[in-house]
Design a protein with these regions (language model features):
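OB-fold/S1-family single-stranded nucleic acid-binding modules
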Residues: 140-163
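Short boundary/loop segments of OB/S1/cold-shock single-stranded nucleic-acid-binding domains
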Residues: 31-43
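Mixed-charge, low-complexity intrinsically disordered segments
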Residues: 70-100
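Beta-strand/loop nucleic-acid-binding surfaces
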Residues: 106-120
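Short aromatic-glycine-enriched beta-strand elements
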Residues: 58-69
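Short nucleic-acid-contacting surface segments enriched for D/E, G, S/T with interspersed K/R
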Residues: 119-133
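N-terminal secretory signal peptides
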Residues: 1-10, 14-26
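Structural detector for short beta-strands of small beta-barrel domains
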Residues: 45-58
Length: 167
């Protein structure tokens, strides 16, 4: 094996160079904007509904600002059918445990899925003004910015699972 690939100092220098390149090319904000699933409290699913604004249909994932229109769980939420996906997600349990956020922010940044996954689910491109709902996760204790990572997207009469591709 080439020593330059295992030398910790060289690896650090390569990472620093890559970070500098990202800053120069303007890609650093995209890297910092992306949150992995482990960043979120996946034990407390939240339900939000409202109108989409500031929609960004691009990678690393589609995102939008959801302007909340109401603060109520739909009576049928726990009984809604959810589509199967490749990842082992217990959708029925998530819907049954869904709650409303405790914080009162009127606008939430919603992280959807990468565009390729949105295409696999055949999600139509969401436009500003579209009515939608999401079930997902925010940071532990609802600390930090009002950001929700969507597990399920409710758009019209369709439900899309966003953790992985359709099963």
């Amino acid at each position: 094996m080439n020593a330059s690939y295992t030398n910790p100092r060289r690896l650090l220098l390569r990472a620093a160079a890559a970070g500098g390149w990202c800053s120069i090319t303007g890609l650093a904000p995209l890297a910092w904007a992306h949150h992995g699933w482990s960043s979120f409290d996946q034990e407390r699913p939240l339900y939000l509904q409202g109108r989409a604004s500031e929609v960004k249909w691009r990678n690393p994932h589609a995102e939008l600002v959801l302007e909340r229109s109401g603060l109520a769980l739909p009576a049928d939420l726990a009984h809604r059918a959810v589509p199967p996906q490749v990842a082992p997600v217990d959708g029925r349990s998530l819907l049954a445990r869904a709650t409303l956020p405790q914080r009162t922010d009127a606008r939430w940044m919603v992280e959807l899925a990468p565009i390729t996954r949105m295409e696999q689910w055949q999600v139509p491109e969401i436009r500003n003004g579209a009515e939608l709902a999401v079930l997902g996760f925010t940071f532990a204790g609802e600390k930090g910015e009002p950001i929700l990572r969507a597990e399920y997207l409710f758009l019209g009469d369709k439900v899309y699972g966003l953790r992985s591709r359709p099963a």
